[in-house]
């Protein structure tokens, strides 16, 4: 398949500071996803269709769901290489995550420990939904830009050239 699903679940480190940190980080990520990176990207990663974190058991555990294009190996590499600081900010609050410094440094930079951590917490996915079969996140972004160009009542010459290049 072009698109795959990833689910991981694990316990949160105990303590009020960790809970407040995790809640604050996820609130920030949610705000940024809606207001800064809302053009189909998560940071510099352009292959993610969907991502969601959900607290469980009175906020003692957490589950992460994601739909992405490519292999699980390329998915993990994208996070390490493109948004490592954000990955560390979220997952460093999880029990067993590779040690970080100042919340966002190190952690996933130890690639093997990070990948081992994810593999230990990965759950098999029984069912999931994809609205646009056969289309990657990049295809969907391009199609959105084509539609916006068709709906536009005025394009500059440069914008018209950029739009035509999408076809």
Task: Enumerate the predicted regions with their spans.
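Aromatic/basic-lined ligand-recognition segments
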Residues: 54
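Short S/T/G/P-rich N-terminal loop/turn motif that feeds into the first structured element of a domain
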Residues: 1-49, 57-61, 67-72, 105-167
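An amphipathic, aromatic/His-enriched active-site/gating alpha helix that lines ligand/cofactor pockets
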Residues: 69-105
């Amino acid at each position: 398949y072009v698109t795959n699903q990833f689910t991981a679940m694990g316990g949160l480190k105990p303590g009020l500071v960790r809970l407040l940190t995790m809640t604050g980080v996820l609130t920030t990520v949610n705000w940024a996803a809606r207001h800064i990176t809302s053009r189909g990207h998560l940071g510099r990663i352009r292959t993610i269709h969907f991502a969601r974190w959900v607290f469980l058991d009175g906020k003692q555990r957490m589950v992460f769901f994601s739909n992405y294009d490519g292999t699980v190996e390329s998915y993990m590499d994208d996070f390490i290489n493109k948004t490592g600081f954000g990955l560390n900010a979220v997952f460093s609050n999880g029990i067993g995550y590779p040690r970080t410094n100042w919340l966002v440094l190190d952690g996933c930079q130890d690639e093997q420990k990070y990948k081992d951590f994810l593999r230990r917490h990965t759950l098999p996915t029984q069912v999931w939904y994809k609205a646009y079969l056969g289309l990657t996140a990049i295809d969907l972004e391009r199609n959105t830009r084509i539609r916006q160009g068709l709906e536009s009542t005025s394009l500059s010459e440069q914008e018209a050239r950029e739009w035509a290049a999408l076809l």
